[in-house]
Each structure stands twice: as C-alpha cells, then as structure tokens.
Amino acid sequence: LSAHHFQTFEGIYSRSEYALEAKYMFGYSLYKQSPVYSLDQTPSYEAISVLQDFINEYPQSAFANDATSIINELQLKIELKEFEAAKLYAKVRQYEAASVTLENFIRDFPGSDLQEEAFFLRIKMAHDYARASIQSVQSDRFMLCVGRYIAFLDKYPNSKFLVEAEE
C-alpha cells in the first residue's frame, strides 16, 4: 500500500522538494514487499527497476548508496533462488532441467559467488544423467561429463570441489 502512495505522490508532485525522497521510498517499499528467496521474486525485480531508475535520475542523492545496497541484496536473493531451483531439480532427479537451469545461472550471473559450485554441479548432473541413461546413449553423455570436467578444471584449477569432481 505504501508503495502505491509514494508512487502517486512522486507522479503528482514531481516538482516537490519531497519528490526525490518519495521516489526512493517507492523503491524501498517495493523492497520491503520482496519475499524470501524461495518465493516468486516479481516484487524484487520491480524494486530493482525502480531503485535503478532512482539512481540514474539522482546519482548524487543521499539515498543513492542505500539504493545500491538494496539492489545488490535483491540481486543476491534472485541468484540464490535460481541456484536453489537447479539444486531442487537435481534432488528430484530431473537432470536435464537441472543442467539447463545451471547453464542459465552461469550465463545470467557471471559474477556470482556461486559460479564455482554451479560449474561443479554441471559435472555432477551430466554424470548422474549419464548413469541413469540407457546403454546406447551412455557413452555420449559421459563424454559430455568429461567435457564439462575439462571446462571446470580450466576455470577453477584450485577448486575446493576438485577432489569430488575427479571422482
């Protein structure tokens, strides 16, 4: 409800001395509506959009640093949701879905702290998928696993997951 009122105020009184604060508070209100990572993140995307617009419009504002911190927090929540979705697919043995979700995660969140684990899980998913496959396609799927292992080794030669990946 507060988000609506701040949005309305900012729209109607855009020349007011409080318009800047109203725009920030609109984004902040959306941020407060953002649920835990396991739920739909539509409010998080909306908050990121509004707060990014705020930063673009008022980069020198006293609220700009807070807005940046909130955006970073919301992005971490979205990253975690995507990563946990991939792990859930793996847990229920939906290996192809887990692989696709991990590929999307790697592409969409290149600077994530979870990248290394995502690369490792790609190997694990390829391996588990190959083992669960019929014999006629197993060799191709194990080759995919080897390819992913090599890519992992190139990117993370000193990984904490290296011992497990070699198995």
Question: What are the roles of these predicted feature ranges?
Answer:
Residues 1-167:
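Acidic, polar-rich low-complexity tracts and alpha-helical solenoid repeat scaffolds
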